[in-house]
Amino acid sequence: MALVFKSIGAHKTPPCTLNLASPALYHTRVTMASTITHPPPLKDRKISSTRRVRTYPLAPEKAEIFNSMHGWVEDTILPFLKPVEESWQPTDFLPDSTSDGFHEQVEELRKRTADLPDDYLVALVGAMVTEEALPTYQTMLNTTDVIYDESGASPVPWAVWTRAWTAEENRHGDIVNKYLYLSGRVDMKQIEKTIQYLIGSGMDPGADNNPYLAYIYTSYQERATAISHGSLGRLARQKGEMKLAQICGTISADEKRHEAAYSKIVEKLFELDPEGTMLALAYMMKMKIVMPARLMHDGKDPDMFQHFSAVSQRLGIYTAKEYTDILEHMIARWGVDKLTGLSGEGRRAQDYVCGLPMRFRKVEERAQAWAENISHVPFSWIFGRRV
């Protein structure tokens, strides 16, 4: 029995397929109206005891594929991790609080950040808030069939990877959070509330607890965050803030290494199960690679994610173009266009995925126009100033 995915032919293609991961692509769809709802207060939410129906539960023989990969994961994926003693830590880049010159170091940092423009600060805060929601991302992997951490300290390689990946990622939000706090340029209490709201809201990437879908999603997102932090570093360098450029570049390098690991997993799945992996990729693209911080809000602006996304698009940090670039990279990286021996459904899935980049390119200008034309709004992160 194969891993069951709904027939590609049985679905209508979403109009222009604009409801995908790039914030701008997501918002160009049909109207510019908000599509993200402000979560109701906890006391007003209806809690159902019925679990959401999973559309694509993992078949036993598919689970066996992942169980059979333990040795491969240990030999091939775990080496992507860096030993803790060889890893950078936030204190390597920030003023030393034990030093007699701490106050002078902080003052110097504040001078360097004084000229960072508001739109850049909004983009940097949004990226940091996304990183700080790390508990949500670990939860996603630990609710995924077969690869989840059964005990919380499981020695199974899949679980070892997830814990160590989380530990490496934890430094990213930590360092930028401390940097922003020391800069004095932003309203930390509003930022902290945004982080708490986001973690409390969670996320549903549409992976249905299915490891095929989960690893495709993480491959995509790790590359997206590598691009975003690389762009933030480039802009910081242009503004003369070399320390921040170094911080962003260091984070981006981590994300590239993590992307390489997740992409390697999907590459192996294409080798072991080309049909099932092809159908999974097509399904994930139909579902859209939703941004992990899509439910971001600060308790005031229910459309904060849209507004933050527009700022990032305008600055060229992460745009509709990058979204399409990632898809093209993945198609080439996994040899999707060269797969042979697929069933009729598999070939339809292959044609669908390989045809998406051309369709996305046609709407990039519309996505940029959306970002340029959206009204500038006040951001609580920068004391209500408009961006």
Swiss-Prot record:
GO cellular-component term (any): chloroplast stroma
Pathway where it operates: Lipid metabolism; fatty acid metabolism
Family: Belongs to the fatty acid desaturase type 2 family.
Residue positions binding Fe cation 2: 169, 222, 255, 258
Enzyme class, first EC level, given as a word: oxidoreductase
Cited CDD domains: Acyl_ACP_Desat
Co-factor(s): Fe(2+)
Role summary: Delta(6) fatty acid desaturase introducing a cis double bond at carbon 6 of palmitoyl-[acyl-carrier protein](16:0-ACP), producing 16:1(6Z)-ACP. No activity with the coenzyme A ester of the fatty acid. The position of the double bond is determined by its distance from the carboxyl end of the fatty acid. Low activity with several saturated acyl-[acyl-carrier protein]s, including 14:0-ACP and 18:0-ACP. Requires reduced ferredoxin for detectable in vitro activity.
Full protein name: Acyl-[acyl-carrier-protein] 6-desaturase
Record-listed E.C. numbers: 1.14.19.26
Location (main, coarse): plastid
